[in-house]
């Protein structure tokens, strides 16, 4: 249940960011106010972590979100038309505490405990790569993965200026996405 709620919240946030990114490049020809807003949002996302707080409608507690988009994009084969970017979404709620999820703008992750693909490899700055085991959201979608041991991920991300994530994708194999930020995660 908690993973499907996080998935929904982060998916909405990622879709908004993705749409803003896509629309920002398409809207260059239109010199209007909405283009300036979209360009501003896209530039903010490219710089690093974006933070958002909201109120849980059920208990009135604060929900904290931090999201960052990869600085690189990878072109997958058909049927995916747009380049694939990766998002890291960190959420904190009163009910569930901290959770870390990665989301792909296109493509499907592979995460199967039986064939040993249920992990991603993460490298913080120039430190040695670390394996983070993953699980799929409760709704069964394969465009997002939850990282086990969010406490460790957050601790390491707080000091990192560069994060690299190598994740396995259906048909496309393992791909590396890079996240660069001038300011480290504040959590």
Where are these regions (language model features)?
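Bacterial N-terminal signal peptides
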Residues: 9-16
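A generic "folded-domain core" signal
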Residues: 22-187
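Positively charged n-region of N-terminal signal peptides that target proteins for export
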Residues: 1-4
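A periodicity- and composition-biased signal for non-globular, repetitive helical segments
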Residues: 8-9, 32
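C-terminal motif of bacterial Sec signal peptides marking the signal peptidase cleavage site
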Residues: 18-20
């Amino acid at each position: 249940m908690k993973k499907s709620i996080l998935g929904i919240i982060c998916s909405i946030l990622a879709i908004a960011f993705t749409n803003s990114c896509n629309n920002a490049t398409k809207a260059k020809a239109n010199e209007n106010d909405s283009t300036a807003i979209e360009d501003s949002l896209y530039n903010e996302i490219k710089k690093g972590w974006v933070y958002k707080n909201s109120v849980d409608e059920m208990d009135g507690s604060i929900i904290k979100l931090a999201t960052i988009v990869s600085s690189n994009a990878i072109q997958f084969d058909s049927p995916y038309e747009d380049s694939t970017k990766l998002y890291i979404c960190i959420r904190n709620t009163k009910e569930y505490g901290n959770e870390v999820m990665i989301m792909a703008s296109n493509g499907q992750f592979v995460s199967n405990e039986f064939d040993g693909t249920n992990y991603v490899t993460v490298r913080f700055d120039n430190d040695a790569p670390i394996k983070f085991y993953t699980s799929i959201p409760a709704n069964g979608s394969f465009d997002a993965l939850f990282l086990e041991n969010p406490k460790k991920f957050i601790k390491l991300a707080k000091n990192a200026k560069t994060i690299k994530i190598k994740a396995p994708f259906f048909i496309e194999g393992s791909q590396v996405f890079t996240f660069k930020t001038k300011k480290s995660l504040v959590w």
